[in-house]
Structures are given as C-alpha cells and as structure tokens.
From Swiss-Prot:
Listed name of the protein: Protein STU1
Biased composition (Basic and acidic residues): 887-896
A cellular component annotation (GO) from this entry: nucleus
Cell compartments where the protein resides: Cytoplasm, Cytoskeleton; Nucleus; Cytoplasm, Cytoskeleton, Spindle
Similarity field: Belongs to the CLASP family.
Biological processes, Gene Ontology terms: astral microtubule depolymerization; cell division; mitotic spindle assembly
Keywords: Cell cycle, Cell division, Cytoplasm, Cytoskeleton, Microtubule, Mitosis, Nucleus
C-alpha cells in the first residue's frame, strides 16, 4: 500500500509565499484529503496549521475560501478515520474557526461548515454541545446568531434521523433562558426573535407560555406575550403536534376513513404467543417449505395459505412486542418477505387477501422496524394496484396506504410511488394521489428538497384525462399548499384558466386555508371591449341602478383580491412548469426558494424586504439550504448585503469571474448563474474579460446557456457567430436574432462561419462540430430563409450576393436538412438568376448537377445545359453570323499591324492557359470548346456558307473542307476528324498532309477575284498560328488537359516517342512497334474499324493471358490478323509474378479521381446499360454453356458475371446464417422475377407485412436466378426491397425487430456481392440507426436481437470498410456522447474497437487523443463490461502509439486522466494481447 503523503501546510504562513503558491498548496492538500486517508501523526499538525492560517487576516478571498473548505474536508476525514481525536479544546478551536468566520460569505460556506461540524457532533455529541453552549454564551452579535442557527441545525438533524427533537431542545433551553435574561447591552433584538422563532417550531402555545414564565427581562418578554401568530395563518388547525403545520394523527385518520373499511378493520381473531424465539424460528422455517416451489400449484396453494395465516397469528402475538428485532432479522434470513410477495401475487383471491392483511398488520405492529423489508413488500402491492379484480386492487391500495402511514421515509419507496402516477391504468394513478398526500402530511420537510418532483407529480395528476384522478389530486394540491404555498401557486399558475378555477373551488374546508381567488375580468368588460371606450346603451336598454351597484361591488371585491394576488406574485418564480421539467441547474436552484408566504416566520419588517430578497438570485443559488431561519437572520446586518439590496453587487463580480475561470464544469455553470443575476441587476461588466471565458464554455457546455440566451443584455457579451451556434443548439426561435441584429451582419456572419465547421482532427473543436454541425447548418439555413423571404434585398454593386451564393454552393453535400438547403437555393436563384447561374458554372461537378436538377424541378424554364459550359450562351448561340465574319476578316489585318490578335470574339472565349486548376473538371463537360481551332474553323466555314448559298456552285464545291467534332464515343472524350468532302484525296495523317489541306483551299480560290478569298486566308492563318501556340496540342486542345485525358486503346500500337512512359524499361517494346513511331488516332478510326462492338477474341497483348503466363501451352495460337505464332515470344515476360508487378505499376500510374456516391452510381448504371455484342469467343461460350446451356438466356454480359451467395459469406455458427437457412427451407420455387414484381406491387398497394419481405429475401438466398438478378440490378429491385424493409421497421406497432436486423444483414451482403453498390450511405445509415434504436430497448445481452445487431455491425465493417467505416466511426462516437443505456454503450464500445482495428493507420494522433479522453471516463465505471471494453480500446490506442514510436512522455500525457494503476492495467492488457 502506498504511504500517505505529507503536506507542509506551515508554509502557508510564510511571508514570502505568494497567493498562487498558497492556492497550489491548499488545492493539493484538499485533493489528498478528499480521496485518501491522512497520516495519523500529521493530523494535529494539519489542524494547527489551518487554524492558525484561517485565524489571521488573509487578503486573497479565494485563498481564504479554499483554506476553509480544506479544513472542513479534513474534519470529515478525521471523523471517519479517528473520531477520538476530537476533544474539548480542539472542538472549541474548530467551531470558532469554521463557524465564526466573518470575512467569508456565510451563505456560501454555511453548508460545508454545517456538514463538517455535524460530523464532530456525531462523534462527540455531549462535548460538542457543551463547547457550543459556552461559545454562544461568551459571544455577541453575529457570532451568537450563528451559534443559535447552528443549534437549530442540530435539532433538525435529530428530527431527520427519526428521533425526538425535543431531547436536543430541552438541553439548550436553559442556555436560551440565560441569554434572554441578560441585561442591556446583552442579547440583541435579532437574537431574541431568533430564539422565539426556534421555539415556535417545536413548542405549542402552552409550552411557550411556560417558557415565558422563566424570562424576567422585559425587553425579551414582550416577544412571548402575544403568541397568536405561533402557527401560520394559512394553516390554523387544532393541531396538537408542535413540529409542523399538520396534526399528523388527525390527518392520517382522515386518510384512513377514505380506505375500504373491510380492509382496515379486518383482523385475525387468534394470536400465538411464544416463550422462546427458537420456537418462532422453527415455525418460520416450516412455513417456508411450501414456498420453495417456483410456481403455485393445486397442491401447495393451501399450504401457502395456512402458512400466511400462521404468520398473521405470530405477528398479532407477543413476538412483535418481545422479539421485534429478532423477528425482522429472521424474516430477512429466511426470505419471509419473498414468501409474502409470492402469496400476494397469487391468482386465488383468499390467499392474496390474507397476504395483504399480513403486510397491514406487520405495519401496525412493527412500524419503523419494518424498513429493511419495505422494498420487497411494496413491489407486489404495486402490481396488485393494477389488478382487474376490484377487490384485489382495493385491498392492495388500503395495505399500501397503511404501510406508508407507518413506515419511515424511504427514497426508493417514494420513487416507486412516483412511477405509479405514470401507470397506464387509471386506478394506480388515482391511488398515487393519495400516496402523495400521505407523504406531504408526514414528511413535508423532506419533500422541500424534492419540490421539483412533487410539482411534476401534481401537474401530471391535475391534467390527467380521467376525472377521478384529477379530483383526488386537487385535494392533494391543497395539502401541499399548507407547508409550501409558493410551490403550490407555481403549479396553479401553470394550469389553464378554466382548470385553475375548478381547482380553486375545491379547497377542503378542514384545512382552513386562507386563499383568495383571483378575480378574473368579466367577459362583458374584456380587454378587447375596453379598447373601444365606454359602452354606450340605447335609451330603452340602459342598465338599471341595481345592476350598477352589483357591478361596483364586484369590482371592489375583485380589486381587493387583485391587491392580494399582486403581493403574492412578487414571490412567484419566473420559470414555468415546463422549464422546471427540464431540471436545469438554474431552475433547480430557483425552485428552492423559502416558503415565506406560508411559514408565517417573517416579521413585518422582513416582509417589507421580501421582494428584494427574492430578486437576489445569488443567495438562492449559492446556498440551497432549506432552513428558512438562515434566510431571515444570517448576515442581515452586514454591509455587503445592504449594498446588494440597493442593487450594487460588489462580491458577485469576483465570484462570477472566479467560477468562470475554474477548471470544473459545475463551477463554470454556477458562474453563468452569477452572470444572470448581474445582468438582471444591470451591473457593469468587462466584456473583454468575459468574452474568451464565455466562448470556451459555449464549446464545452453549450446547453448551459439556454436561460441566458433569453436575456437581450447577454447577447453583446459573446461574438455573433458563437451566439448563433448557441441559439441553434438550444433550439431557440430565429426571430430574436432577426429583430436584434442587422440583416447584413447576420448574413456575413453566417457565410463566414461555414468555413469553421470543418476543423482539423487535431483541433479541439473537431468533436464539437462532429456533434452539432448538422444542427448549426440547419439553423443557419433557417435564418437565411427567414431573412431572404422577407423584405431584404441585396444592394446593387455589392459582393454580398456573390459571397452568399458561393458559400451556399460550396456547402452542398454535407450533413444537413436537404429540404431547407434546396429551399434556400431556390430563393437565391430567384433573387438574381443570371448571376446565380454564372456562379453555378464554377461549382464542382457533383454539386453543380445536384443543384441544377433541383432548380429544374422548381423552375421549368431553367435550362440544364446553361451550366454545362463556361461560354456565355447568349454570345455563342445568338450572335450574328455576319458579325462573326467581320471579326474574322479583320482579325488578320489587326494581327499584321500589331503583331497580336485583337479579335474580340476570340479574346472573350480564350481559356486561361496559365491556370489549370479546373482542367480536371473540364474533362467531364469540355468547357473550353471555343478554344479549339476546329471550332474557329467551323464558325468561319459556317459564315462563308451563309454568304455563298446563291453564288457559283463550282466555287462552293471546291470549298469542301469541313471540320467535324465527333463526340459519340460515350466516355466523354472528344475525337476530332478532318475530312475532305467532295475531293478525291485521302485524309491527312501527318504534317505534310496538313500543308496539303491548306494548299487545296488556296488552289481552289487562286486566280479568282472572289472577295471571300480573304476569309479563307484568315482561316489558313488561324490554322498555322494555332500550330505555333506553345500551349495547344495538335488537336486544338490544351496540352495539360490532353495529357490528363489521354486515351490509349489496348488494340492500338504504342507510340514510341509520346507513350514511352506507358511501359517500363522497354519490356513491352518490340521491333515492329519501334519502326512505327508515327501512328495517330486515325489508325483506330478507319472505315473497317467502325464496328462499335468489342471483339473479345482479340485479346489485348498487355492482358493476353494466353501469351503471358500459365494459360500459355506452347501451341500455336491464332491472333486477330490470322497469323500464327509458334513457341515463346522473346519479349514476353517469363513469369506471372513479373507481369503482375508491371500491371500493378501501371495501375499506380493511372490517375484515380475521387468520385462521390452519386457520381459513382451514375457511372455504374451507365456501364451496366451498355449492350455488348458477342462474337464467336470460345471462352465466353463455354462459360455460358456451363451455366445456362444456351447463350440466349443472358440479358447482358455483366449479369452473367454476377453471383449472389449470402450464406457462403456468413460463418456457419452465426445466428443470421441460421435464420436465413430457415428462409431457404421455405417453398419459394414460384418466386421468379415476375412473381416478385407482382408481390412488390401488391405490397405497395396494401399493408406491408414482414412475411412478404421474408419470402423475397428467401428467394434471393436459396436460388438467385438470372431474371431475379436482373431485377435486383437493372430494375432497382434491391433498392425497392430495402425501402420496403425500412418502411416496415419504422411502422407503428411493429414488433419483429429481430427479423428486420437479419434481413438488413442479408441485403447488405447481397449488395456487396454485386458488381456495383446499389445502396447509398444514407441507406446504410438507416440500418445502423435502426440497430441502435433496438439496442436502447434491451436490458440484457442474452438476447437474439443483440447478437443479430453484432453480426450486422460485422457485416458493415467487413464489406463496407472503405466506403462507410469513417462515417460509422463518427456515428459511434456521436452516439457514445449521448447514450445512457447499458447495453447500447457496450455495443458502441465494441464498435469502436472493431473500427479501430481496421483504421488504426488512418487515424491521426489528435483523433486518437480525443478518443482516449472520451474512453477514460468509462474506466472507473461500475459496470464491468464498460470497464473491460474501455481498457481494451485504450490498449489498442496505446499499441498504435507504440507502433508509431511515440515518446513515453507523450503517451503518458495522452492517458493523463488515468491513475497510475489504471495506466499499468492498460499496458498489461496491450502486452498480453500483443504476445
């Protein structure tokens, strides 16, 4: 065992020690005392050091508070460790230092001081009372007041422990008499009133008069002369109990009268007495024999009934009087309570009734001694309250009420009664109202600490749909009104007006409650009618004098009632019942306000200051003590409190800053409550100092700001971007921001904040935005929609519209509400269509098409092709051809004069040759078409033809050069062909042929005076200049773009110069290819090669398996040209490994373009739709023949290459394989493609059933034929089946969740075995979310649903690791932050472990650190499985760090939350698992 540390507290008194060092010493000592034992030989030294330190003045108030708190913890630790240390002198010093500190705010430290001194009192009660009495007699002023208040605390402690409080009161009575009889200047007026108020709580009037006879001081005696106000005016009863507002016996008797008399008065006539308790034990053992069987049968129920009757006789005998403790212990040892529970739940009414009567008689006879058996005995009664037999429910109700009337307060019993108020049956809810009434009568002081639960209970009963429940709860509400009027009024104020009037009319007369009903405004004098002025009547219908008098009398009564209600409203809380239900920290403290209106303990002077006290929120928040005398007498004379009452919060600023600067979240949240108090008081605040503290806390705990966000004065304290995020997370309306801030500021803040939503993994905001990013996105879209849908308009010349559109388009594809997003897109599009379309052209391809498709749905006039090219559609399609001719004709002259081209038409459309960042996008849509020479040539030829339509046909025929742009390849690439139409020449294929083309054009025009000759010269010049452009290739395109889109046919011979990089070290070159260096694309597009079908017998040389490796057998193989090859080619690779290595290198050289999910699906669908023509290929024919016998049964080539084997992908011992095997047994022979299509249509037009989906999946599992496979892939059958399963799982009342998980797993495996995925990540997320929802309903791991969910997770990770695993990891982390269910958290921890095994090398150190911080909180949890999986995960993270050669100090810092033994356990687990 580690030796306890020794702290040098004497250093605190050194002059050279600064305040920061003192804080460090005290913090370390306090942490040590709270968690560990202290050394026995250091206890006295610690006490002496802290007493001396707190006895001297300390400048730093925070240091003094920390020292006081450390001493309180030390006292409690010593009281537990060595209670004998407290002696007379030590007790005296500790009381003076802990209780009588004048420089501290007593209300803040009073609770800790009381708890520590109570620990001393429990150790040495007599010595403590003696020292406290001596200190009280010797002190004056505020110190004596504190001593008197602490005496009242000791009396309450005695009462809370179910002991007689009068014992402690009587021990202090003599001291109080001496204090009251002191001569002037002796006891102050405040101390006299305090002693009087203490005595009023425990003495009745007769006892007070007897006490007053001992008081001889006239100044003190006058406070005891008039005692009519001894009890509260709202609870004047003929009570004989001095300790509360109720006469408990009388009220409980009234409750008993409401119970069924046959149950209350029923009693067994016989009683059995015993001389020795050993005989009792023998009889009890004999009784338990009949209850050893699990079930009740025809043979043992009579024996059980006889045993219960015997128990009743034993209880009614002398055992409960002579051997009560021994009897209770024997019942616990022999499980008698379980026997009684079994008998009570019997279906035989007589046996159940005898058991209930037995519980009732045990409650009467044993009373508080029955506490160890309360839980077990109340459970069967709770079940019987919902019984259909009325006699059973009535008997159980009476028994439970009697049990609550006699048993002591038990928190678990109280919680079970609260659960009854939520029962689905009417009877338990009605009985719960009576049970709450019993608790109020007996334990109203205890319920003050649980006022929020009581208010919720009352509210639920008062608004119950059943009349009998509401009627019972109305009476209970007025019982709660007697001890806690403010809380009851709060519940009343939350009721609708009509319901409130009914409740006010049901006040029990025997409670003598003085409650004035608030007069409501008459309907004849409503606010709407009064706005029209004085009502005017015609002369024949004017009201009479008598009606006017009645109206005036009613108004006078209503006025007096309104005066009363206004005074009561000053004490009413600002929060409503709905906000109380959320149980936030601020509301919890607000609900603990003193019961000033009903207690009657405040004098007239105190009542005058009542409103100011209730507005002082700091006092309510810092001290939640229930003693009302504290709020009346503690620190009422201190200047700080006087200044607070005047509205000058002097100490709250320091408290707020110190709390907000704390390292613990709870203290920071208390700092927010201080801030709210200061904002209500309009105190000046330092915004520069508060801003960083609030921003940091808004990231750490954003939901703590909900109450502050409703205050407009809080909004300037935090940046607008953070304020918007807080509004989004707390789900507050947007109109507050729209009304307070300008539209421009909101728009600029929102669009600039989009950039911060995606921080790096090492940023501390990473997990924050992972959790709240989608919520903030949706809220920002809502702000912009509300803003732009109103009167806001973008100013002309402003760049704001461009910035907004750019940011919104860039946000496409993220995780948010797409409906809101597209609504905002349509609003922006309508604002400026032309500019929005221009900006949309610059967007990425995937985002561009998504937005364009949505705009096309919303606006039928939207042209989808307008975003396909960078060119301006107005200029390129609607310009005048003659104007084009003029520009082209003068282009050559301008070029000759200036040396440069000044053509406006070319300069506008010329691409930016220096910027190639969009080249990758251009490969999809060819946006630089106008930059190609062929397009220039085509435009000039077109203009020439327009002018020559009616001229010489010979000249027209001679000009037959046409440029065709052929884009029919289907793969997005552009192939340019130059043809001479009408001329008997061959198409050019080299450099000399290009010259021939220009010569032919020139020759056809030479010797003529045709003015169009200049046009052709311009064309010829354009061709020549285009060849000289350094950045344009031979085909008129950009060289960079051409290199990116280079297409090399596998049937084309390689070009030795330009394609030398396609081979590796000349391994694939042969002499024939080296001779043909000038092979262009024209060789591919000869007339005889225009057949669009693929010749599968022409196997390419690079991938020719027959010529490369194991398929080669040395025989002659005929190639495509009919030649034969004998032996082995010397250029052929020698082995399979060499060729596979070369192929791998070629694959690495190929550029891989990241495609999103939608583009991948479009590409996959396009490939699947290609019809491939078959030729006589022995390989294809053999594969077809062996499967179907004839090749005509295949619909396309890709289908024959696909195969689904779901059971083969599952382990043999998996639960999913077992369930799918049962589906395979079903008769699904008739489930062909047509039958499945009919079934799907029938399901969509009728009710969806799980059996139909199971039959379809069974057909896929058992025998997936080609038509069925074709339906799954080409007809989107898999997606339709998935949608049906999702609709089935989300249907109301669906109970076959286990089957849904199995079917989800089957479809996931089927999708993974297809050539392309037909399920999106959103659909995968639906299955994952469904599994998590079902796990939240489980209470144990021994469940088939849990095992099926585990196998679903394994399927996702195994088959979708590359596409879905990052999203799965993010979802698991997000769910782990909010999950509370035991089974669900275990499942998520296992998911993180499996995901970490697949992504360990892909995660950064920052992400690993964030996961480590999240997982370390589960290491010390009570649940074993949480501890195990968290240790396993931390060991995995530790192993990753070790594998990356991270320093040991860095690894330890990443596990800083763990203690050293826990960290050693992580390392041991890693070592064991690694070995």
């Amino acid at each position: 065992m580690e030796e306890p540390r020794v702290h040098n507290l004497e250093k605190l008194m050194d002059e050279g020690v600064a305040g920061i060092e003192q804080l460090q010493i005290l913090t370390a000592f306090k942490t040590h005392v709270k968690k560990e034992l202290v050394r026995d030989d250091s206890i006295e030294r610690y006490f002496d050091a802290l007493v001396r330190f707190l006895g001297q003045p300390v400048e730093d108030r925070k240091v003094q508070q920390l020292g006081h708190s450390s001493l309180c913890y030390l006292i409690k630790r010593v009281a537990m460790q060595q209670p004998g240390r407290f002696q007379g002198a030590r007790i005296r010093d500790l009381v003076r230092v802990v209780l009588l500190q004048e420089q501290l705010q007593e209300r803040k430290v009073w609770g800790s001081a009381v708890k520590s001194l109570e620990a001393i009192y429990l150790c040495k009660p007599q010595a403590f009372e003696a020292e406290l009495a001596s200190i009280c007699a010797a002190t004056r002023g505020s110190d004596r007041t504190k001593c008197l208040l602490f005496m009242d605390e000791l009396i309450q402690l005695q009462q809370m422990n179910n002991r007689n409080p009068m014992e402690v009161v009587n021990r202090f009575v003599d001291l109080w008499v001496d204090v009251l009889n002191e001569s002037d200047p002796g006891c102050s007026k405040r101390d006299i009133e305090l002693i009087h108020d203490i005595l009023k709580k425990y003495f009745n009037e007769a006892m007070l008069q007897q006490f007053a006879e001992r008081v001889v001081n006239t100044r003190s005696l006058k406070h005891f002369m008039h005692t009519e106000h001894a009890a509260p005016s709202s609870a004047q009863t003929t009570s004989s109990m001095p300790s509360g507002p109720f006469d408990v016996d009388e009220e409980l008797t009234r409750v008993m009268e409401e119970l069924p008399p046959n149950v209350v008065n029923s009693n067994i006539g016989e009683a059995r007495d015993y001389l020795s308790f050993e005989h009792v034990v023998k009889d009890l053992e004999h009784i338990t024999v009949a209850f050893q069987a699990i079930k009740e049968t025809e043979h043992n129920w009579k024996q059980r009934q006889e045993g219960i009757i015997t128990l009743r006789k034993i209880v009614n005998g002398n055992v409960s009087r002579q051997f009560p403790d021994e009897f209770i212990q024997a019942c616990r040892d022999l499980n008698i309570a379980d026997c009684i529970s079994k008998a009570a739940l019997s279906l035989r009414t007589t046996l159940s009734s005898h058991s209930c009567h037995l519980i009732k008689e045990m409650a009467f006879k044993l009373g508080p001694l029955l506490e160890p058996l309360l839980d077990v005995l109340f459970v069967p009664l709770r079940s019987l309250l919902s019984a259909t037999k009325k006699i059973s429910s009535q008997t159980a109700f009476a028994t439970a009420a009697i049990l609550l009337c006699t048993a002591p307060y038990h928190n678990r019993l109280f919680q079970q009664c609260i659960a009854l108020s939520r029962d689905k049956n009417v009877s338990p809810r009605t009985f719960a109202a009576v049970f709450l009434r019993i608790y109020i009568i007996r334990f109203h002081r205890r319920l003050e600490h649980s006022s929020v639960l009581v208010e919720e209970w009352l509210h639920k009963g008062l608004t119950d749909p059943q009349t009998q429940v509401r009627e019972a709860m109305r009476v209970t509400l007025w019982y709660w009104y007697v001890p806690n009027a403010q809380s009851a009024k709060k519940v009343l104020d939350s009721m609708p007006h009509q319901m409130k009037r009914i409740i006010e009319g049901s006040i029990p007369t025997y409670l003598n409650i003085e409650y004035h009903v608030t007069a409501s405004v008459s309907s004849n004098e409503s606010s709407r009618r009064s706005s029209f002025g004085v009502r005017r009547y015609p002369s024949y219908a004017a009201p009479t004098q008598s009606s006017n008098l009645q109206k005036l009398a009613a108004n006078s009564l209503g006025g007096s009632a309104n005066v009363r209600s206004l005074s009561e409203n000053t004490n009413r809380h600002l929060t409503t019942y709905t906000s109380l239900a959320k149980k936030s920290l601020a509301t919890r403290h607000e609900s603990l306000s003193p019961r000033v209106a009903s207690s009657g303990l405040i004098s007239s002077a105190g009542a005058a200051n009542l409103s100011s006290e209730n507005l002082e929120l700091t006092e309510e928040l810092t001290s939640n003590h229930s003693n009302t005398l504290l709020k009346k007498y503690l620190n009422t004379n201190e200047p700080a409190v006087i200044r607070k009452s005047e509205g000058e919060p002097t100490g709250d600023l320091e408290s707020m800053y110190s709390h907000l600067s704390s390292t613990t979240l709870q203290e920071k949240q208390q700092g927010l409550l201080f801030l709210k108090n200061l904002l209500l008081l309009k105190a000046p605040l330092d915004i520069a100092k508060l801003n960083p503290l609030l921003v940091q806390l808004s990231i750490q705990s954003p939901k703590s700001f909900k109450d502050l966000l409703t205050l407009a004065s809080f909004h300037p304290l935090i940046p607008l971007a953070n304020l918007i995020e807080l509004f989004a997370i707390n789900d507050l309306p947007t109109n507050v921001l729209l009304d307070e801030f300008s539209s421009t500021d909101l728009l600029e803040t929102v669009i600039h904040s989009f950039q911060t939503f995606f921080p790096d993994h090492h940023d501390q905001l990473f997990l924050y935005y992972v959790k709240y990013r989608s919520v903030i996105f949706n809220y920002c879209f809502g702000i912009m929609i509300d803003l732009l849908s109103g009167d806001f308009a973008f100013s002309e010349g402003s760049t704001l519209f461009r910035e907004v559109c750019t940011r919104i388009i860039e946000a496409c594809g993220n995780d948010f509400n797409m409906e809101k997003y597209y609504t905002l897109i349509s609003i922006l599009y309508r604002a400026d269509k032309s500019q929005f379309v221009e900006l949309l052209r610059d967007a990425p391809v995937s985002s561009k098409f998504k937005i364009a498709n949505e705009l096309q749905r919303c606006d039928s006039t939207f042209n989808l092709h307008s975003i396909m090219s960078r060119e301006s559609t107005a200029e390129s399609h609607h310009s005048d051809p003659n104007q084009q001719y003029k520009d082209g004709a003068h282009g050559g002259d301008a070029r000759d004069a200036n040396g440069t081209s000044n053509s406006s038409s070319d300069s506008d459309n010329e691409p930016d040759l220096e910027s190639t960042k969009h080249l990758l996008e251009m490969t999809m849509v060819n946006p630089i078409g106008l930059g190609c020479v062929e397009n220039v040539l085509q435009s000039h030829i077109h203009a020439y033809k327009q002018d020559q339509q009616h001229q010489d046909p010979i000249a027209e025929k001679s000009l037959s050069t046409v440029a065709e742009v052929n884009d029919e390849d289907g793969d997005g690439s552009t192939t340019t062909q130059m043809k001479l139409m009408g001329a008997n020449t061959t198409e050019p294929s080299n450099e000399s042929d290009k010259d021939k083309t220009s010569d032919i054009v020139a020759e056809s025009m030479r010797g003529t005076d045709d003015p169009n000759y200049a046009k052709l010269c311009a064309i010829d010049s354009a061709l020549i200049d285009s060849e000289d452009e350094p950045e344009l290739n031979n085909f008129g395109g950009l060289k960079g773009l051409t290199e990116m889109t280079k297409v090399v046919s596998i049937y084309e011979k390689l070009d030795g110069d330009e394609d030398v990089e396609m081979v590796d070290d000349e391994k694939f070159k042969d002499p024939v290819e080296q001779e043909n260096q000038e092979t262009g694309l024209d060789e591919i597009f000869r007339d005889e090669k225009h057949d669009q079908s693929v010749k599968f017998n022409d196997i390419p040389r690079i991938i020719d398996v027959n010529k490369s490796w194991d398929r080669y057998d040395g025989e002659s193989i005929e190639d495509t040209s009919g030649n034969t090859s004998h032996g082995t080619d010397e250029n052929r690779p020698a082995s399979f490994g060499t060729v596979s290595e070369l192929v791998r290198k070629e694959m690495e050289k190929s550029p891989t373009l990241p495609l999103n999910e939608e583009d991948s699906k479009l590409l996959s669908d396009g490939i699947n739709e290609i019809e491939l023509k078959h030729k006589d290929d022995p390989f294809v024919r053999d594969s077809e023949d062996c499967e179907n016998g004839t090749p005509q049964d295949r619909s396309n080539f890709l289908s024959c290459k696909q195969h689904i084997d779901i059971l083969g992908a599952l382990p043999d011992n998996s639960l999913t394989a077992f369930e799918l095997g049962l589906l395979e047994i079903l008769d699904v022979s008739d489930m062909d493609a047509n039958r499945i299509l009919e079934t799907v249509n029938t399901i969509q037009n009728s009710r969806l059933r799980s059996a139909d989906v199971s039959r379809i999946v069974g057909a896929i599992v058992s025998h997936c034929t080609d038509p069925l496979l074709h339906w799954l892939t080409d007809s989107n059958g898999l997606q339709r089946l998935w949608s049906m399963l999702t609709a089935l799982s989300t249907a109301d009342g669906f109970s076959d969740s286990y089957k849904c998980v199995v079917l989800y797993t089957a479809l996931l495996i089927a999708n993974s075995q297809l050539s392309s995925s037909h399920l999106s990540t959103d659909e995968l997320s639906d299955a994952w979310a469904f599994a998590l929802r079902e796990l939240s309903k489980l209470s144990s791991y021994n469940n088939e649903t849990y095992i099926a969910c585990c196998e679903l997770r394994e399927t996702l990770i195994e088959h979708y690791s590359s596409s879905y695993l990052p999203q799965l990891l993010e979802s698991a982390i997000k769910e782990l932050n909010v999950a509370e269910d035991r089974v669900r958290i275990t499942f998520l921890l296992q998911t993180l472990s499996d995901a970490l095994d697949h992504m360990n090398t892909l995660l950064s150190l920052e992400v690993l650190g964030s996961m480590s911080s999240l997982l370390q909180q589960f290491v010390t949890n009570d649940f074993t499985e949480w501890r195990y999986h968290s240790i396993k995960l931390l060991a995995q993270i530790y192993g990753i760090l070790v594998a990356r050669n991270s320093p040991a100090s860095y690894i330890r810092s990443m596990f800083s939350i763990l203690r050293q033994p826990e960290f050693d356990l992580v390392k041991s687990y890693y070592t064991m698992d690694h070995n």
